[in-house]
A protein has these predicted regions:
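Glycine- and charge-rich intrinsically disordered segments
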Residues: 1, 243, 445-480
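Extended, helix-rich architectural segments
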Residues: 1-141, 466-480
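Extended, regular secondary-structure scaffolds
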Residues: 124-226
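Extended, charged amphipathic alpha-helical segments
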Residues: 194-344, 386-389, 397
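Short, surface-exposed acidic
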Residues: 326-331, 378-386, 423-438
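Glycine-rich and small/hydrophobic secondary-structure elements
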Residues: 345-359
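Extended amphipathic alpha-helical segments with heptad-repeat/coiled-coil character used for oligomerization
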Residues: 362, 375-411
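Long, highly charged low-complexity segments enriched in Glu/Asp and Lys/Arg with interspersed Ser/Thr
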Residues: 425-459
Length: 480
């Protein structure tokens, strides 16, 4: 009897799946060098390209770092603070969104996604089911160094995705497909499937958060552009030149004309070293046979202001490239700027932050729609109206925000107890909830007080009716 053992799809990839995995892996590897280069500039670990002209070979190992790329990226990312996610038409009925966000710590995790997107040009959010049926969906932020996707620009959706990782020093990967997520490990014979999750969602549970998109480049670009890297290299070379000049010319050179050889010898007639001659506090010379005294002079000392002026010029150029106020990069003037002038110089940075907020809102809405789809198996109509609540990137003063909100309330444009009014004042989502709770408690106490007053008045009126005839009779007797 011949028994045929059927091939288990769980243990192997199909030919199409294998080809797709290899294509995604090749795409990831082809872009990794560029991503790692941006990462080096952000961390200050880049190797500065030396021109080989003014730096001697002995000092080429000198490494100078200037953190302007990190300052520029961090200044923008620090203005991208998420407060909450909610439904546009029902902000008070957004409990399921709050549950998902709190379970995944998305307010904090979103900062990682935004930072990676600004550094690398993109980051990814992968959505999966929770460890337990009662647990909210799991949302993880993934680095573009380990993950990539194929994207359909027409549908504005991810077609497939791949994430690489390691399990006990063994290469592994997750292949994200519209109807399944496949976990594989690398073996000598190829990729071996260790888990296949047939979720049947109809789309891969992956969202790409892209930065600086263009119509012909939806993958996104980094804020650390080629211009930023070039200026950083130039500034580092200038700092390196200043270090070399300090080593060679920090101590001014001296010259002595007409001195005898004995002036450079010690008491025993041995020649003094160059350092002993240079560092001697007193130089004593004898007159020659003609009665002449040797001429002693000094060359002009090293002036570092030449280099500092060049660095200031690079700082202004870098501030223009990054859209930052020059004082963010250490460039200052003799006259300190006023508060209004500082806010004026930050206008471009604020506008860039507002654009990033609008750009990142769409992928975050897609992340929550995927989470709801995984949790409930269905997408309600209101899932299309999920919005991200951002903190004001302009960081205005509380006084100016309060003044603007007060004027709108006085003009009758906004009600005083509106949540929009509290949002304009600058209160966070949690603070607004506490204000509403305090108002409800105050209204409840006032309602109880009013009810008590009404009951007391009613009892007083009832007692007045009961005692009214007796009081009238007593008055008549007294009058008689």
């Amino acid at each position: 009897v011949t028994v045929t053992i059927p091939e288990l799809g769980l243990l192997s990839l199909t030919d199409d799946e294998t080809n797709l995995l290899n294509a995604l892996r090749a795409e990831l590897m082809s872009r990794r060098f560029d991503l790692e280069l941006r990462d080096c500039y952000y961390n200050g670990e880049q190797v500065v390209r030396d021109l080989g002209i003014s730096i001697p070979p002995q000092l080429r190992g000198l490494h100078t770092v200037i953190g302007w790329p990190q300052i520029g990226v961090d200044a923008l990312e620090q203005r991208l603070d998420v407060e909450a996610w909610r439904y546009k038409d029902a902000p008070d009925d957004s409990g399921e969104l709050e549950e998902i966000a709190e379970a995944n710590e998305l307010v904090a995790e979103s900062q990682l996604a935004h930072l990676d997107s600004l550094i690398y040009g993109r980051s990814y959010a992968a959505v999966g089911s929770g460890d337990d049926d009662d647990m909210p969906p799991l949302i993880s932020i993934e680095s573009p160094l380990d993950m990539t996707v194929f994207y359909d620009a027409r549908a504005r959706a991810v077609v497939s995705g791949l994430r690489l990782y390691t399990i006990e020093d063994q290469d592994a990967a997750v292949l994200y497909l519209p109807d399944s997520s496949i976990h594989v490990v690398a073996t000598n014979s190829g990729w071996e499937v260790i888990d296949r999750d047939d979720h049947n969602l109809g789309l891969p549970p992956v969202v790409r958060i892209s930065n600086r998109q263009r119509t012909a480049d939806r993958i996104g670009r980094s804020e650390i552009t080629n211009a930023v890297m070039s200026i950083t290299d130039a500034a580092c070379r200038t700092l390196m030149g200043m270090e070399v000049a300090r080593e060679f010319y920090g101590a001014p050179q001296r010259y002595i004309l007409g001195a005898a050889e004995s002036a450079f010898q010690d008491a025993e007639g041995n020649a003094k070293s160059a350092w002993e001659t240079y560092l001697g506090r007193v130089l004593a010379f004898e007159r020659d046979e003609d009665g002449e005294v040797p001429t002693v002079g000094q060359f002009a000392a090293y002036d570092p202001s030449v280099y500092t002026r060049i660095i200031d010029m690079y700082a202004r150029i870098m501030a223009t490239q990054l859209g930052l106020p020059p004082h963010y990069l250490g460039y200052t003037t003799d006259n300190p700027a006023s508060a209004d002038a500082i806010r004026s110089t930050e206008a471009q940075l604020v506008k860039r932050a507002e654009r990033k907020q609008a750009l990142f809102s769409t992928p975050w809405s897609q992340v929550f729609r995927l989470a709801i789809l995984i949790k409930t198996g269905d997408l309600p109509d209101r899932s299309r109206r999920i919005e991200t609540v951002w903190r004001n990137p302009a960081t205005p003063t509380v006084a100016s925000q309060t003044d603007a909100a007060t004027k709108l309330v006085q003009a009758g444009i906004l009600p005083a107890d509106s949540d929009v009014t509290l949002e304009m004042v600058g209160l966070t989502e949690g603070q607004r909830r506490r204000v509403h709770a305090d108002r409800r408690r105050a209204q409840g106490r006032q309602a109880l007080t009013d009810l008590g007053n009404e009951l007391a008045a009613a009892r007083q009126a009832a007692r007045g009716l009961d005692t009214g005839p007796e009081v009238a009779d007593d008055a008549a007797v007294e009058g008689g």
